[in-house]
């Protein structure tokens, strides 16, 4: 094999080229590749975190929805209980008012009945005195008449 200057020059040039590439070209390429690998790994981690966060958010939303439904059910139950309580109170108040009105009407009726009895007693006494006057054919003075009327009224 014949080694001449051209081959030696090519070998030196190739060695210089390899050294130059290793010194100046290779590090930026490796850095770019490493940065790209890091970005891809970070992107995959972010996607995994996002998927976990989505699952967690869906679970939280489901829990909140269940809690809201439970709260709504409780509020409806409380409203129904309050409604029943208000109806019962109104019914009791109406019953009490009814009893009050009936008692008042009964008292008024009794008072009217007593007044009518007293009036009838007075009329009967007046008629009795008038009849007695005619029978006796004399007039009784007012004081004596009043005493007689009161006496008769008390007896009736």
UniProtKB/Swiss-Prot annotation:
An annotated GO cellular component: proton-transporting ATP synthase complex
Localisation per UniProt entry: Cell inner membrane
Membrane spanning residue stretches: 7-29
Alphabetical UniProt keywords: ATP synthesis, Cell inner membrane, Cell membrane, CF(0), Hydrogen ion transport, Ion transport, Membrane, Transmembrane, Transmembrane helix, Transport
Signal peptide region: none
Gene3D superfamilies assigned: 6.10.250.1580
Membrane topology, record value: Single-pass membrane protein
Gene Ontology MF term list: proton-transporting ATP synthase activity, rotational mechanism; proton-transporting ATPase activity, rotational mechanism
Function: F(1)F(0) ATP synthase produces ATP from ADP in the presence of a proton or sodium gradient. F-type ATPases consist of two structural domains, F(1) containing the extramembraneous catalytic core and F(0) containing the membrane proton channel, linked together by a central stalk and a peripheral stalk. During catalysis, ATP synthesis in the catalytic domain of F(1) is coupled via a rotary mechanism of the central stalk subunits to proton translocation.
Family listed: Belongs to the ATPase B chain family.
HAMAP family: ATP_synth_b_bprime
Oligomer and partners: F-type ATPases have 2 components, F(1) - the catalytic core - and F(0) - the membrane proton channel. F(1) has five subunits: alpha(3), beta(3), gamma(1), delta(1), epsilon(1). F(0) has three main subunits: a(1), b(2) and c(10-14). The alpha and beta chains form an alternating ring which encloses part of the gamma chain. F(1) is attached to F(0) by a central stalk formed by the gamma and epsilon chains, while a peripheral stalk is formed by the delta and b chains.
Full protein name: ATP synthase subunit b
Organism phylogeny: Bacteria, Pseudomonadati, Pseudomonadota, Gammaproteobacteria, Vibrionales
């Amino acid at each position: 094999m014949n080694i001449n200057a051209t081959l030696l020059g090519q070998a030196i040039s190739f060695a210089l080229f390899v050294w130059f590439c290793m010194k100046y070209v290779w590090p930026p390429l490796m850095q770019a590749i490493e940065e790209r690998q890091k970005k891809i790994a970070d992107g995959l981690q972010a996607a995994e975190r996002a998927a976990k966060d989505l699952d967690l958010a869906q679970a939280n939303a489901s829990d909140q929805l269940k809690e809201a439904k439970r709260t709504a059910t409780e509020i409806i139950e409380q409203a129904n209980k309050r409604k029943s309580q208000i109806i019962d109170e109104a019914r009791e108040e109406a019953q009490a008012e009814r009893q009050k009105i009936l008692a008042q009407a009964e008292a008024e009726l009794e008072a009217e009945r007593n007044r009518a009895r007293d009036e009838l007693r007075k009329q009967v006494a007046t008629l009795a005195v008038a009849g007695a006057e005619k029978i006796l054919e004399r007039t009784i003075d007012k004081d004596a008449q009043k005493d007689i009327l009161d006496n008769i009224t008390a007896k009736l």
